[in-house]
Structure formats: structure tokens, C-alpha cells
Amino acid sequence: MMKIITYNVNGLRAAVSKGLPEWLAQENPDILCLQETKLQPDQYPGEVFEALGYKSYLYSAQKKGYSGVAILTKREPDHVEYGMGMEAYDNEGRFIRADFGDLSVVSVYHPSGTSGDERQAFKMVWLEDYQKYVMELQKSRPNLILCGDYNICHEPIDIHDPVRNATNSGFLPEEREWMTRFLSAGYVDSFRTLCPEKQEYTWWSYRFNSRAKNKGWRIDYCMVSEPVRPLLKRAYILNEAVHSDHCPMALEIL
């Protein structure tokens, strides 16, 4: 069995100061996929995670204090691929892949469109490019686990107020349609597949006391390619972890 956790930490150094290593020692995943690390490699507190038995692979944005993804793993990967080979995205440190035998694990941070029209347009182009890239990758690496912050809620069950949020980035009709297309192209939302009726969230705004009121969004996913579906054992949201405005999601596979 393998346990994988995905977690948008909203600044890794801040999360470490809020007890992330102690929490990680308790949860003890085989692989931890991080998003929004917001640091450069020379700022990475590697010894903290090394002490817990993790090897670290980081892919940082060029801009300091922004974006960035990482994979921490107790198992030695056969290969690590940094980026997608597309400069506009790779400059922002959004995609890293580690291969373990015939299984590939990705940590991905999809763009947010909340800052305005320009970034929303960037996000929509990224979504098409991401799907094309993943589908091409799947020809050589069919067993994919695509973990990360997708910055999209798919269905009304995934968001606390679907009516009022229907005009907000993250729940726009065109974003939801993209996710429907992505899933129908041969990818599986592990949490929704294993927990069809659970209304749980992975992100809450820091404003309006949203987390205490559980006014949240489910935007963090462990997607898997169709060949991995039979291996799905358990998927669950760890909403007691409070190192970030997101909480982690765990996937256990056979």
C-alpha cells in the first residue's frame, strides 16, 4: 500500500513554524506533494524533513515568495521531471513529476484567476495546455496520480454557496466544464469517486471567519488516470490540519 498526501501549504516556512513537521511525523505518508512552497531552494529547511526520512525535490518559481511545488518522498524515485517544458508555466514553478516503477506522481499548482481578467485568461489557456500535456504524458506513463491545487470546484457539492459563487473564479461555468471534460477524457477524482456524497472542503478564505463557519471550497484533488482506478483504496480530507488556508487530502492506493 502507498499513502500520498497533497497539501497547499501557502508558504512552506510559515507552515513549518506552525507545526508541519510534527504533523507530518504523525501522518507519515510515503509521498507528500506540496504546492505554494513560496521559497527558493536555498531557503528550504531540508534538514527538518530529512530527519523524518524524506528526500526532497523542489521546483520553485523564478519570482521570489511565489508559487512553487515540491515532492517529498520516503521512496527513492527512478526519475524526477521538473516542469512541463513550457516556459510561461515553468517560470512559475507549477509542475513536478516523480516516477516510481510504473507509477508517476505529480504535484501541480494550477493558476488562480482571482486577481483579475488577465490571470483568468492565463488560467483558461493553462487548463487546455495542462490536459494536452497530461494526455501526451500518459502515452508513455499510463499510471498517473495528479495531486494538487486545481483552483476549481467541480460541482455544487464541492462549494459552500454554489449560487452566489457562480460568478467567482474557481466556480465559473467554463472552469467546471473544463473539469467535466478532463474527467471524461479518462481521469478520476479519487475523493468524489470513493466518497460520492461527502460535503467536505480543502480551502477557506482567511476573511469572514470562513473556516470556523466551514464556508469552504474543495479545490485540492488527487486525480488519477483510469488505469489507477482499481488501485484506489481510500481518499479523505484532513481538515484538522491548520498550517495553511488549505488543508491536506490523502489518498491510499493498493
Regions found by a protein language model. Name each.
Residues 2-10, 102-114, 147:
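Active-site-proximal beta-strand elements of phosphoester/diester hydrolases
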Residues 2-16, 22-23, 27, 41-57:
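Internal alpha/beta domain cores that form substrate/cofactor-binding pockets in large enzymes
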Residues 7-8, 24-42, 105, 134-156, ...:
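Active-site beta-strand/loop signature of hydrolases that rely on acidic residues for catalysis
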Residues 37-40, 45-113:
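Structured beta-strand-rich core segments of catalytic domains in phosphoester-bond hydrolases
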Residues 52-55, 128-215, 219:
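Metal-dependent phosphoesterases centered on the DNase I-like endonuclease/exonuclease/phosphatase
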Residues 64-79, 198, 210-230:
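Conserved beta strand-loop-helix elements of the APE1-like EEP
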Residues 85-86, 111-127, 163-167:
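Surface-exposed cleft-lining segments at the edges of enzyme active sites
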Residues 236-254:
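Surface polyanion/phosphate-binding segment centered on an Asp-His-Pro turn
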